[in-house]
């Protein structure tokens, strides 16, 4: 009986490893798109051991597109603003765990099952060129436009309309420069923050692995397939 249980556990772990390997080495999209456009735009993929964000360099056009975020305290027009940083995730874990010291059982449980989603937005200065956890990616102007549109479409809005106001989650932030907003979709362990980041990169014309639930796998796949 004990050996049977061990074999089942071992088989399950082997299957998970196989899925992670295949999810990384099999590209999405499977066939490379049109690469004729000049990749004169740079975006950043920011990562820590469990989460990824996408950072867009601030310019006048980006300020205009995301001017609505000012109502949530995001200082898009601040003269020192260099990047707008976007991250999608599960509401309980994302909003209640700013540091590992804040880790609690219920948010972890919800992140492993099913939870409503939120969008975290921060405005930052520049990032050092050699900063760990920062991957610089080059994309075309058309890819950049698609990416901005996809990020904007990830916000949940009043009346469910694309032109409606974004929904600020009042009283929740990590510091003075960031805010949380209601987002579209549901978060779970299989389709989490890193699969959202992968989907955004795909919109930008960056190929990723087919399924990359971990930051390290997403970074590896972006290097492998581009």
Spell out what each predicted region is.
Residues 2-28, 32, 153-226:
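Activation targets extended, charge/polar-rich intrinsically disordered C-terminal tails
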Residues 31-32, 37-182:
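Non-catalytic ligand/cofactor/substrate-binding and regulatory segments of enzyme domains
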